[in-house]
């Protein structure tokens, strides 16, 4: 039974990864090979004319991306770098702040905690068009337009509610007995959070980071 489950997982993993592998292979093809009706997926360095499933790998596609295109001011790699920097920093900020906030809601008796959690979640209910004008006016006032910092603040604020709710569920599953034993040994709350909660919440933080990164990247 275990082998059957493992086989099913491998089968679905191959189906999920195959399009990514095909895209990666196609990026090294020439224009003629990429639009060929024959599925050419095996690279070869043979100088003779290839046929069938073989193709000559080339880096022309990546060279074209290094130049500005379609009236753009910069190359594709410049925009890719900006997206990566903004996405990574906003993800780290959202997961860090969300984990700290979730720990407070999970372990302390906060008056009106349910209302506060609903308020945090309700920030995702608003359609983007409802906040475009206020955000634009605020960014103009503080000169945050067309800046990395402005986008990082925006994406962090947008993903913070998701981070809080996801991390609260993960932290709730961590037994409080670990913290009680640490308190008896003289640990402070900060040491408990850093040495006990965070290491056990790493899987949840990883999942949350994936969601936040996808959200920031798609924007």
Tell what function each PLM region has:
Residues 2-219:
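A structural signal for multi-pass alpha-helical bundles of membrane permease subunits
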């Amino acid at each position: 039974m275990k082998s059957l489950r493992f086989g099913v997982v491998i089968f679905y993993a191959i189906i999920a990864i195959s399009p990514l592998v095909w895209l990666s292979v196609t990026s090294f093809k020439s224009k003629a090979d990429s639009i060929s009706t024959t599925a050419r997926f095996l690279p070869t360095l043979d100088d003779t004319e290839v046929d069938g499933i073989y193709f000559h790998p080339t880096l022309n596609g990546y060279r074209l991306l290094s130049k500005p295109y379609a009236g753009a001011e910069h190359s594709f790699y410049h925009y890719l770098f900006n997206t990566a920097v903004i996405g990574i920093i906003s993800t780290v900020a959202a997961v860090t702040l969300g984990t700290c906030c979730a720990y407070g809601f999970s372990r302390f008796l906060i008056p009106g905690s349910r209302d506060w959690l609903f308020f945090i979640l309700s920030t995702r209910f608003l359609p983007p068009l409802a906040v475009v004008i206020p955000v634009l006016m605020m960014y103009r006032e503080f000169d945050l337009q067309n800046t990395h910092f402005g986008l990082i603040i925006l994406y962090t604020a947008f993903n913070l509610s998701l981070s809080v709710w996801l991390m609260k569920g993960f932290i709730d599953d961590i037994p409080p007995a670990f913290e009680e034993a640490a308190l008896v040994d003289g640990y402070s709350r900060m040491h408990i959070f850093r040495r006990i909660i965070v290491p056990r919440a790493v899987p949840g933080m990883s999942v949350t980071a994936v969601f936040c990164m996808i959200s920031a990247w798609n924007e």
